[in-house]
Amino acid sequence: MIERGKFRSLTLINWNGFFARTFDLDELVTTLSGGNGAGKSTTMAAFVTALIPDLTLLHFRNTTEAGATSGSRDKGLHGKLKAGVCYSMLDTINSRHQRVVVGVRLQQVAGRDRKVDIKPFAIQGLPMSVLPTQLVTETLNERQARVLPLNELKDKLEAMEGVQFKQFNSITDYHSLMFDLGIIARRLRSASDRSKFYRLIEASLYGGISSAITRSLRDYLLPENSGVRKAFQDMEAALRENRMTLEAIRVTQSDRDLFKHLISEATNYVAADYMRHANERRVHLDKALEFRRELHTSRQQLAAEQYKHVDMARELAEHNGAEGDLEADYQAASDHLNLVQTALRQQEKIERYEADLDELQIRLEEQNEVVAEAIERQEENEARAEAAELEVDELKSQLADYQQALDVQQTRAIQYNQAVAALNRAKELCHLPDLTADSAAEWLETFQAKELEATEKMLSLEQKMSMAQTAHSQFEQAYQLVVAINGPLARNEAWDVARELLREGVDQRHLAEQVQPLRMRLSELEQRLREQQEAERLLADFCKRQGKNFDIDELEALHQELEARIASLSDSVSNAREERMALRQEQEQLQSRIQSLMQRAPVWLAAQNSLNQLSEQCGEEFSSSQDVTEYLQQLLEREREAIVERDEVGARKNAVDEEIERLSQPGGSEDQRLNALAERFGGVLLSEIYDDVSLEDAPYFSALYGPSRHAIVVPDLSQVTEHLEGLTDCPEDLYLIEGDPQSFDDSVFSVDELEKAVVVKIADRQWRYSRFPEVPLFGRAARESRIESLHAEREVLSERFATLSFDVQKTQRLHQAFSRFIGSHLAVAFESDPEAEIRQLNSRRVELERALSNHENDNQQQRIQFEQAKEGVTALNRILPRLNLLADDSLADRVDEIRERLDEAQEAARFVQQFGNQLAKLEPIVSVLQSDPEQFEQLKEDYAYSQQMQRDARQQAFALTEVVQRRAHFSYSDSAEMLSGNSDLNEKLRERLEQAEAERTRAREALRGHAAQLSQYNQVLASLKSSYDTKKELLNDLQRELQDIGVRADSGAEERARIRRDELHAQLSNNRSRRNQLEKALTFCEAEMDNLTRKLRKLERDYFEMREQVVTAKAGWCAVMRMVKDNGVERRLHRRELAYLSADDLRSMSDKALGALRLAVADNEHLRDVLRMSEDPKRPERKIQFFVAVYQHLRERIRQDIIRTDDPVEAIEQMEIELSRLTEELTSREQKLAISSRSVANIIRKTIQREQNRIRMLNQGLQNVSFGQVNSVRLNVNVRETHAMLLDVLSEQHEQHQDLFNSNRLTFSEALAKLYQRLNPQIDMGQRTPQTIGEELLDYRNYLEMEVEVNRGSDGWLRAESGALSTGEAIGTGMSILVMVVQSWEDESRRLRGKDISPCRLLFLDEAARLDARSIATLFELCERLQMQLIIAAPENISPEKGTTYKLVRKVFQNTEHVHVVGLRGFAPQLPETLPGSDEAPSQAS
């Protein structure tokens, strides 16, 4: 039998009153006796401190403070220590007879908080002869000793051979060692466990029924069913992990898409930018070289343009100088033409106006005569009309007023008298005494005839007067003409001068006729002279362009030479054109071939990438399409073999899973029907009874029971008979054994044990021989061992199955990849490398470009020579026809001679133009100048006489006319008679009035007609006079203007002036055209020079910028390449197919990827920041950093339990292979892991039943415990009603609540909590989560209610409460409960600790005087029966009969306080024996 460990002694070093005191502890009861303040509590406090060195729990209060929530300020420890190093050590010996010293080093910490520093330690391997006080003290002399500090103690112990010293930094480690060595009964894993242990010690220390323990008896007494709970937790953890893995797979599936998307977009984003920079670097290098070539070419062009500009500027200056002279000449010629045209127009006007004046003169004279006659007739008509009017008026007046009529008659009488007077005057004037009124009319005609005759005679004289006056005017006119031509002279000299002028006029007219021929001759000579000058200018220009002076005789030979050169150059240019066309054609063919290859290159590169990937995946090299198809056949064969092997491993794994599931059944039943039958029969499975059998005993019991190892143990077989009738749902062989499940043993068989076998005598005539199984399955330990081995095998099989599944799917994916490759790339994959051919073609293209450039330069020089030769030939073609002009030296003299003759002729023409009209007028009347007419005065007198005679005749005719007109008045002779009373006067007046009115009307009409005619004649005359005066004045103005012009206007003057002007205009236009051409060419040349200068500057700037950019980009590119190579991403980024895309396409690709990446990394702050930094176009290396960050991020997110690679791209490929396999496997695993609600109910019920049985066993040990009136103590265990209902529903009505247990969103614990809430809606769950509640419901202890009951006197069984018991009864009852707890802890920990160790049992009791002698004896008996040590403190009047007693007396010696200790052991019936070391020397300060 295993001996129980014991505490041997307690050692106090430097405590208050104890300098170095060791208390040897009794195997049962150690009593500390002494008065108040003797040190009993200090001793117990030292023991507790060494046992539980946790300052958060230690609180040593006095007994009077029991129940108080606060004690002394230092919690009772600081004041119990002395200054300096203190120790409290427990010397123990365990079941293995190992001596172990555990203890603590204590030291007061200075300060107001009164803290204590505690360091736990342990000493193993210490010899039994060494006392604890000798370890920690050093003797200085006979009366002085020194306490060793902990480091010196360590050094001292390390010097001792075989002694181990351990210092602990953790209380958990300290207690773990104590548990493993059997010093304490329970493993204290946490602060909660330490608290329970301390409350237990504290309750025993102060005595009584501790409410802290009784309220949580389940935690103290009922062991945590760690196996069941761990099984549930493992199941839930496995399910949770399984679901989390499934969720992780779903997340990984989404991650796979995210990875694909992120890697794809990141690769597109960075690779596009990477390749764009690579392309741009190459483009920049090409541009830099191109800029350098263009710079050299532009400099050459600028030098040529500058030379050209100087030549054109010199020629333009010459043309500008000539243009001024030509403009002046042209302006003079234009002015002269205008003057000639003006003079001709004036001359025409003068001639026209002279003709008009002559005509107007004639018409004016005729009109004057007509007007004079009309005036005379008008006067006669007016007189006649007036007389008729007067007569009418008189007659009207007479008729109106008779008196007036009388006056009229008187007037008429007067008129009659006047008429008579007129008749007498006519007689006197006409010298006609016989003239009467009646004969007056006849005489009137006679005298009118005389008047007409006199008028005709006067007109004849007037005509003669006019003719004389005309002759006089012709002489005057001729004289005035001579004066106008020659100037003033005497009248008698006019004849001679006129003849001289006429002769001179003839000569001048002859000269004037020569003007036109001379002018034509001069124009011809001047034209030849100008052509000569133009030829000289062309020759000078030609010589200047040729850079050499040529003689006239050399020009024809030079012309032939230039034509020959043109022919040769034309052939060269033609041949060069053909050669250039051939080179261009070859270049275009190369370019077309390069374009086709560039279009084919991405396809070929994609095929090569796919081929390389296939080669990497399969580790083979393929050189032809046949190799690919052959390997594909091998791949199919390998796939079939892998599938067969995978299916075999899967079948074995399923078999192992089924065996594990069968062995994992609760109670060891391999058939679920046995559990139902056991519950139905009220029995227990035999495997449950032997569930705790050890692994070593499992083969024996398995062989012992043989086939009946799965029997059901029932209390009474007779009661089972009725249940067996009609039983079908059971195994083929059902074994039933009668026996008590609580005290079942193997006595039912007669057994003989052999070597690794047993012989079981079932009956007298039936034996059974059974060998020990190699793999026993009887008992939980055996099953767990088998399950563990099966799990190991399953892990191997699972790993192998996963490997094979992975290989199969990998092979399938490889087969798919080969199929895709064959379908997409096989046709082009094994063709020649287009990029190598492109490089060759590019080198050839460069050579062609260089040849074309050289050819263009040569052709340009030949073209320049050809153009120069053509210009020379063109110039010679213009010069050669004018060689005779160049050789004519007298042309200028002839021009001057003709110009002088032309000037003379033009003077004569101007004389003729100026005086030609006067000479023409003078010539017909020049003869009148010979004599001056003298009879003009006599003619004037005759004309005056005729005029007098005509007037006299007119007077006589007028007088006769008056008589004739007053002929009516002679009829008024009877007016006297009318006044005397003639009665018919009125009638006569009326008749005369009518006659007078008729006469008046005729006179008015005649007067009106003659007045209109006269007005018309006067108007015509006024118009003629006005026209004549106007034209005369205009004629005079025109003549003056013509004289002012000073140009002779002949018929050829205008034509000559126009020809001259046109010639000058043509010359000026040609000069201006050439000047404009030169100016435009010069402007264009200057613009070209400016453009070339700007282009040169820009090219220089661009070249240097590009060169600097190339240099800078080279450094940045080197950094990028270094970063790419260091991180191993060059293969991912250097995608050669992107090199054939344009920069815009790559930028667009990068921008699109950037937009997608912004959305993809929106939730990742790190990647978002790195992406934002990578957007800087000036820092391309940041994009590489982003790509590396993406790879690192994806590597971190790769689930290593699913994917075993660091490469995200390979991870994606493996994901697609693994995910479907893992999904299927985990789904089946979840179905296997899930436990039914009925199984949970059965497990909890079985556990409750087992613990109830255990509590009954504990109660049996307490049946004989009595304290005072308490006769017995027991624990009552009941199942809570709400939890019992939950178990019933789980086992019987679980189908109604499958919505909870089949939900993938709820764990089993959460589903259990939901069911509990559904069954008990009245219970408030508070703030606890369903998971917490479910975990509590999986703990069987929460299903039980426990309470302590005592059998006290006549009250019977009642609940143990301090108020219902006396103090001693309460102390005894509490001690009994504590003993039960300790025993329960030991049973609970037996599986955790070694089988050969039985832990120490020790309790305390302070102030034991409250117990009577019978109760103390009961405690002693309890300690003896339970092998428990007890330390009690009691006053001096307590004297136990057994155990060891220490009598403590506190004394003061020389101001030093110490405790005097005397120890006694078993004073009755043995003699007292003084224990060693009972006297203690006074403590001295060291």
Curated annotation (Swiss-Prot):
Q: Where is this region: Flexible hinge?
A: 666-783
User: Whom does it interact with, and what assembly results?
Assistant: Homodimerization via its hinge domain. Binds to DNA via its C-terminal region. Interacts, and probably forms a ternary complex, with MukE and MukF via its C-terminal region. The complex formation is stimulated by calcium or magnesium. Interacts with tubulin-related protein FtsZ.
Main localisation, per the record? cytoplasm
The record's annotation in NCBIfam families points to: PRK04863.1
> Do you know which PANTHER family this protein is assigned to?
CHROMOSOME PARTITION PROTEIN MUKB (PTHR42963), DUF4476 DOMAIN-CONTAINING PROTEIN (PTHR42963:SF1)
Q: Where in the cell is it found?
A: Cytoplasm, Nucleoid
Q: Could you identify this protein by its name?
A: Chromosome partition protein MukB
**Residues reported to bind ATP:** G34, G35, N36, G37, A38, G39, K40, S41
What keywords does the record list, in alphabetical order? ATP-binding, Cell cycle, Cell division, Chromosome partition, Coiled coil, Cytoplasm, DNA condensation, DNA-binding, Nucleotide-binding
Key word ATP-binding present in the record? Answer: yes
Against InterPro entries, the record matches this protein to: MukB, MukB/SMC, MukB_hinge, MukB_hinge_sf, MukB_N_dom, P-loop_NTPase
An individual GO BP term: chromosome condensation
Its biological purpose is as follows: Plays a central role in chromosome condensation, segregation and cell cycle progression. Functions as a homodimer, which is essential for chromosome partition. Involved in negative DNA supercoiling in vivo, and by this means organize and compact chromosomes. May achieve or facilitate chromosome segregation by condensation DNA from both sides of a centrally located replisome during cell division.
Task: List cellular component terms (GO).
Answer: cytoplasm; nucleoid
Domain of life, source organism: Bacteria
One GO MF term on file is: ATP binding
Q: Which family does it belong to?
A: Belongs to the SMC family. MukB subfamily.
| A Pfam family | MukB_hinge
Q: How are the domains described in the entry?
A: The hinge domain, which separates the large intramolecular coiled coil regions, allows the homodimerization, forming a V-shaped homodimer.
List the residue ranges forming a coiled coil, or say none.
326-418, 444-480, 509-603, 835-923, 977-1115, 1209-1266
SUPFAM superfamilies reported in the protein's UniProt record: P-loop containing nucleoside triphosphate hydrolases
What organism does the record attribute this protein to?
Answer: Escherichia coli O17:K52:H18 (strain UMN026 / ExPEC)
